[in-house]
Amino acid sequence: MKFFIDTANLNEIREAQELGILDGVTTNPSLMAKEGISGKDNVFKHYKAICDIVDGDVSAEVIATDYKGIIEEGEELITIDPKIVVKVPMIKDGIKAIKYFSQKGIRTNCTLVFSAGQALLAAKAGATYVSPFIGRLDDISQDGMELIAQIVGIYRNYDYQTEVLAASVRHTMHLINCAEVGADVVTCPLNVITGLLNHPLTDSGLAKFLADHKKVNG
């Protein structure tokens, strides 16, 4: 399973990259705004800065919601760096644009996916990634993890090459459950990735080893 970090914060991206397990980055307009990045030139420079840090794919989201606008924005975004993946919303014109991009060899991430039917359309259109949102489904008392399992199963049935990129991952159990059902990628905040490091028995065991070492060696 690939690990992507869901942030536009350069320090967090560097920290995840330094762990040696980072496979990519996902961003969105909200994350850019959180970092105070505004204006097309600044946004593009920030994407380039992200690409300079990581070795893997960087999802950059279009703002347009019409077919022509999505195409224009996507074709601009890919000029930033070969690592850029165009993030396209799950809407009618988005699906049409994903098909266009697929035919042109431009990689895409279909975002805001909340049903297996939407994921099926994205795969049929040739999306590189599809991003189902686990946490947001959980927020409305629907089972986000069940959706991930459904999509993984459907894609395996038909040998679709679209990768299931689980998004809106809120905690480590979300991440572990995604691994259990076979998600190809998980994108999450830095604290979820680093949360995998922690276990009280690891801490107590290490403390005992160090204490015993001190007793023996003074």
From Swiss-Prot:
Principal cellular location given in the protein's record: cytoplasm
Q: Where is the active site?
A: 87
What domain of life is recorded for the organism?
Answer: Bacteria
Q: Which GO terms describe its molecular function?
A: aldehyde-lyase activity; transaldolase activity
* Subcellular localization(s) per the UniProt record: Cytoplasm
GO aspect biological process, one term: pentose-phosphate shunt
Q: Does the keyword 4Fe-4S apply?
A: no
Named in its record, the pathway it takes part in is: Carbohydrate degradation; pentose phosphate pathway; D-glyceraldehyde 3-phosphate and beta-D-fructose 6-phosphate from D-ribose 5-phosphate and D-xylulose 5-phosphate (non-oxidative stage): step 2/3
SUPFAM superfamilies for this protein: Aldolase
Q: Between which residues do disulfide bridges form?
A: none
Enzyme class, one word?
A: transferase
- Indicate yes or no for the key word DNA-binding: no
Going by the UniProt record, its keywords in alphabetical order are: Cytoplasm, Pentose shunt, Schiff base, Transferase
Reactions it catalyzes? D-sedoheptulose 7-phosphate + D-glyceraldehyde 3-phosphate = D-erythrose 4-phosphate + beta-D-fructose 6-phosphate
Q: Name one GO cellular component term.
A: cytoplasm
InterPro entries for this protein: Aldolase_TIM (IPR013785), TAL/FSA (IPR001585), Transaldolase_3B (IPR022999), Transaldolase_3B/F6P_aldolase (IPR004731), Transaldolase_AS (IPR018225), TSA/FSA_arc/bac (IPR033919)
Instruction: State its role.
Output: Transaldolase is important for the balance of metabolites in the pentose-phosphate pathway.
Which family would the database say this protein is a member of? Belongs to the transaldolase family. Type 3B subfamily.
Q: What is this protein called?
A: Probable transaldolase
